[in-house]
């Protein structure tokens, strides 16, 4: 392990001790609470959309969230370990067969929906 990998591992361990990141993947609908700085004030803004892909690993890992805002598609890339991310919450799990859902860019309306993943009833009740 070279020096850069060792430093990245130390930073990753330090950041992951303070931050809790849920397990989510492509197709999942997530709410990302982002810290927004306006002048001297800092506020938290919620960004809800479908995760269309994850890339990278360790400190360099990022994910792309797509939402439709006023009829226009908006995509935003978030680094997982960014200090600007306050929290990540998974709203619903999607059932998809691809790692990257770039085909959603060409779909509109009902065809852009993602089927919800069924969970075990025994696991859900306990």
Swiss-Prot record:
Keywords: Ribonucleoprotein, Ribosomal protein. GO terms for biological process: translation. One of its GO terms (cellular component) is cytosolic large ribosomal subunit. SUPFAM superfamilies: Translation proteins SH3-like domain (SSF50104). Disulfide bonds: none annotated. One of its GO terms (molecular function) is structural constituent of ribosome. InterPro entries: Ribosomal_bL19 (IPR001857), Ribosomal_bL19_CS (IPR018257), Ribosomal_bL19_sf (IPR038657), Translation_prot_SH3-like_sf (IPR008991). The keyword Ribosomal protein applies. The keyword Cell inner membrane does not apply. This protein is located at the 30S-50S ribosomal subunit interface and may play a role in the structure and function of the aminoacyl-tRNA binding site. Belongs to the bacterial ribosomal protein bL19 family. NCBIfam families: rplS_bact (TIGR01024). This is Large ribosomal subunit protein bL19. The lineage of its organism: Bacteria, Pseudomonadati, Pseudomonadota, Alphaproteobacteria, Hyphomicrobiales. The gene is rplS.
